[in-house]
Structures are given as structure tokens and as C-alpha cells.
Amino acid sequence: MDQLYLEIEISTQNAETTIYTSVSSFLALYTYRYLNEPKNIQVNFVATKIESGKIALRSSQLRRELTDQHITCREAAKLPAIRDLRLPIYEKDGNTFIAGTCAVCRELIARQPNTELRKLLGFKESCLLAPSEASIWTRFCEVDVVDVVSRLHEGLLLKAVPDEVVRFEQHMNEPVRMHNIYKQAREQANQTENGAKIKRKHRVQIDGRTPKEQLLIEHRFAEGISFTIADLILYPLLRIVFQHCGQMLPHFPLTSTWFSEIDSFDGTCAKILGDLYVPQAASQGEELLSIPDCDATSLYKADPKRYKPRNRIYTSQAEVDLALAKLSELQLVFSTDSEHTYGQQTIDWQKIEPTHAKSSALPQERLERKRQQLENMANAVVSLAQPGDRIVDFCSGTGHLAILLALKLPLCTIIVMENKSFSLAQAQKRALELELSNCVFYQCNIDYFVGRFDIGASLHACGTATDIVLQQCRRSVAHFVCCPCCYGSLQPMPHISYPLSQRFQRVLSTNDYLYIAHTADQAHEMGTTNCKPETTLQGLQCMSIVDTDRKLQSEEAGYQVILTRLKPEQCTPKNHLLVGRFVKQN
């Protein structure tokens, strides 16, 4: 039986007990109730101290679930995943654990045999499939609106309607984006009022040359004309937000219509919210709130209106030269030359992957280069590892590095972490074929991992992901082995700012740093098409600069760091390797 772990906090005052939960766990519980409490899923509650805004639950509605055998204390939990991941967590197949609001709610639905329920996952079951780092829409549902509700339950007093409400109203005013929209438009145009089809000779013709904006298809639900998991998540969140907004709902007619559509389509959405949620005492008066101005862009990534060239950073050679000149003040040598190498070839790939060379879609030469990259990474990790270590392969993909480490380090626990379900399933399949028992699989974003570990590894984690991995290693005082990638994709985040090291921060601004990072992506293999030697040499220099900054930041945190290159160097243009061993607490 699958397991669902939800976060609760038990508070007793004046002999009265109140059960609180986090917003994310509330959404998972809400989805579980909407699915009519499926028999193949057991709900478990994890007692902890909820850090952000907490929601009071109607405990009378949870008598069956809130029993001693289904409540555990997080610190005393026997299951490591409960301590490793942010709740809620979905466990399936005994060794796979899923974290993240949308991913957990999707899995609750996907594991149901009822095909009608699985239609909630949308076309090709892809609704909210992309992780929040890659999808503006997933981020809106999983992070932005959740954060608003959380802050409201921390006591936030509104002076204006939250931006997220305005953005959703604008989203509902955008043209519908859906698969086969022209077919849907033809069917809609050729139906009578009672739903019958119009005779062939009177049919309206609509072809692909008609602009989508002119198709008479309007948002009935959040993603178009079908009720999906996006509606299931947003409905309770926005209902709660409007409870804190006084009399503002009439000022958002499309959102109001959307609420009415859902209430008439399936009244259980409102009923479940009423059954589970204890409304806060009204803290907002009857006065009207102001409505903020927000850019009228859709919540989908591929929106031409979002492309604003003035807001993008373009790199001119003059700006690069100026940034490099500022760095000269530090009098540092930016080099990846090192006496330390990890390119020893000790792996019998035929034994590990007897049929992979034949079945792989990769050409033989590229397959060989990939194996060389993996061998360098594995050798570096082995040089740091001790029996009993917990080793995390961040951004693991289909698990090639993790599985190699599991084979080379049978006394260590290997955590395979990847946010794409399909890739993780491939990794599980290979681990099963090799009968590995020391692998655990976590489907989640890097930020959802909060556990302790001894070594962190990442092979070509894209852009800022490498810096998030390094940040995780510093948090856990863990050694690290990182081969960075996509330098030009570096972007500041709320918890990551550039430059990274104190020494770089003294001479470079964020824009200076990003000019250098963009230039680092010009490092191509010498002799390839369109490769200018002077441009490539400058790109290699900028790669060394960015990774030197990473090295300095780690050294400031008490690490001894080796910056070297993979061997042979031709195995990948992005061949830098950072190997860090924690030596002292500053």
C-alpha cells in the first residue's frame, strides 16, 4: 500500500486541542479527500513544528486518520525520507519518495485505477508535470499562491489585493491554449443549442489559418475547457485568499465566474473545503482594497508578450573586457591545471551494462565520452567516501552516476534525486536489473531536500543548480564533487546571489559577473565548426573565473577544494571538476 505523509502541529490550550497543518499538506489532504479517500493509500501524520503559516483543521473530520498508530514525530521517525524531505511526501514501491505539492497531488491521482479520475491530469497526463523551476504555471500553483495563503495565516494584513489574484484574472482573460484547439473550435461551432450536430451542408469551416485569438473558445476552467488538477489546487487556495479580501470578488468577474463553474460542475470542491478548513477570524474590514497593476502576460512560459529585450542582458566585448579588468585587482590566477586527476579507467562497462552499447540511442563515440565523464565523477566520490556514508546524486537524470556509485560503494547509501518522474523510473529500472539494494529514489526539486548527508555529487547540473547543490553541501557540512554546466544560464535567485565569494563581491557587480558567465558558454571544442580560437580561449578563461569563484566561496566556508579537469579533456567541453573536502568550521 502507498503511503501519504502529511505535516501537522498539535497545539493544546485551555484543555482544547487544535490540529494545524501547512498549506502544502492541506492541499495534499484536500486532493486525497476529493479522490474519495482511496483504499490503496494510507494517510500518516508527522508531528512537527510548522515553520511558515499554518492552517487549522477540523479534527472532527479526521477521527479515522488521527490515531496514535498513524501519527509519528518527525525527529523520531524511523523512515529517513521523513527527515530528508519537506512534507507532504508520497511513498510508493517501498523505496521511492515524492515531495513537492504538485508532484504529490499528481501521484495521488496517477495511482488511481479509475480512468475518469486520471483525466484530472489533463492531455497526455501532463498537467503540472513540469517542475516549478521550469514552468511558470507550476510555480504559480505550487509556490506563488501557496506563499500568499501561508503569509495570510501568519497574520499578513492586506492593503492591496495580492498580485497573484490579479495575475490569475488576467490569465483567465487570455486565449485558451490547448491541444487540438481547432478541432475543438469546429465541434463547438457546429453544435446546436441542445448539443446536436449541425447538418453537413450548414457546417462552419475553421482551418489552421484562423488566429487562435479569434476562436470562440473561452476559459471555463484554469487550463481551458476541462476540469484538471490545476483547478483542484487553485480552488481552495483562491477561496481562502478571497476570505481575506473583504468584498473584492465582484471586481474580478472572470475569477468569480470560474468559482461558479467549479461549484456547478462539482459541488464536492466547496464541501471538502468546508469540511477541512477552519476559517480565521475576519481580520480584514469591509473597506475595499486597492488593485495592483500587473503586466498582462499569460502564466505560460511560451508567451511572446513575455519577451522584453530591454530586460535581457546582452554581452558586448567591451563589457566583458571591463569586467575582466576589474578582476585583475584581485591578482588571482584563474587556472584549472592541477596535479589531481580522476580519469583512471577501472570500470568494466561490459559487466555493468552488457547490452547498453547496442540498445543505446547514443553513437558509440558519444557513449564512450559519457562513460569517461562518469568514471571521473565516480573516482572523485570514491576518494572522499567512507563506509556508511549517505551520498546524494543531485539532478541525477536516469541515474547513471548514482548506479555506478552504488556498485562501487556497496556499504554506502546512494540517494538518487531527480525531479522528472520518467527519468527516475528509468533509474529505478536499471537499479532493479542490477539487483542494487543500497539505492533510495527521491523525486523532488533540490530545495525540497532538507536532510543530512556526507557527500553531494552533480554531473552537469544546469546553471544555478550547481550553486544550489554546493549550498546544500555547505548546509550539511558534506564533501562535494561537481562538474558544472550551462554557465550562461546563471541567474540570481532569492537564496543565491552573484558573485558568490567575498573576494569577488569586492570588485564585481552582479551584471559584471553575468557578463563573464555568458561569455563562459562560448567555450567550444577546438577544431569544431564555427569555433573561433580567440573566442573559445576567452570562454575557457571565463569558465575558470566562475569556477574559481565557486572554489573561493567553499574555501571561505571551511573547505579544501581542488579545481581540475575531467580526463581525457575531450570527453566534454564543460570539463571542469570541483572536488571539495570539508576540513574546518570557520
Curated annotation (Swiss-Prot):
Similarity field: Belongs to the GSTCD family.
SUPFAM superfamilies: GST C-terminal domain-like, S-adenosyl-L-methionine-dependent methyltransferases
CDD domains (alphabetical): AdoMet_MTases, GST_C_family
Protein name: Glutathione S-transferase C-terminal domain-containing protein homolog
Pfam families on file: Methyltransf_32 (PF13679)
Chain ranges of the GST C-terminal domain: 121-276
Protein source organism: Drosophila pseudoobscura pseudoobscura
GO cellular component: cytoplasm
Gene3D superfamilies cross-referenced by the UniProt entry: Vaccinia Virus protein VP39
